[in-house]
Amino acid sequence: MWWGYSPALDLQDEWERYSSKKYEIIKELNILLIGAADGRHVVKTLAQTYRHGNNLKINFYVYEASLDLVARQVMLLTIALEPPEELGLQDKTRLFLELYGNTLVRPATANFIARKSAQFVHMVTDLDFQVYLWCEFIVCSLVV
């Protein structure tokens, strides 16, 4: 399943529409995605956060039966969230679409996948790197 059976949803909007607690002020929204097979709902929700005008923290929890699908989602979300200084909009779009819909990729895309894959392995297996990322996240959260 590559493309999904439903259009991308703004899950924060869906929560506001159907929640019985819609007038209750919450600081954190936890979203569990099971078998979504791609990150379209995550991307749409993140892209639409400005419309809601709140400072809501959104946690996404993704469960997939196949670890390959999780790795694919993480790679696609990494491309979408890559800083503009690292990857321009046109390059980001080409890379995202190439990985989203193709089996064969260009050499430049294969190099990007290899670099990011090594970074992901480092993130998971190196405790010092995890502590560094956590500290960096805390500092960035405090600055914002």
Give the ranges of each region predicted by the language model.
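N-terminal charged/capping segments associated with class I S-adenosyl-L-methionine
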Residues: M1-R51, E64-P84, R94-Y100
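Class I S-adenosyl-L-methionine-dependent methyltransferase module
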Residues: Y50-V144
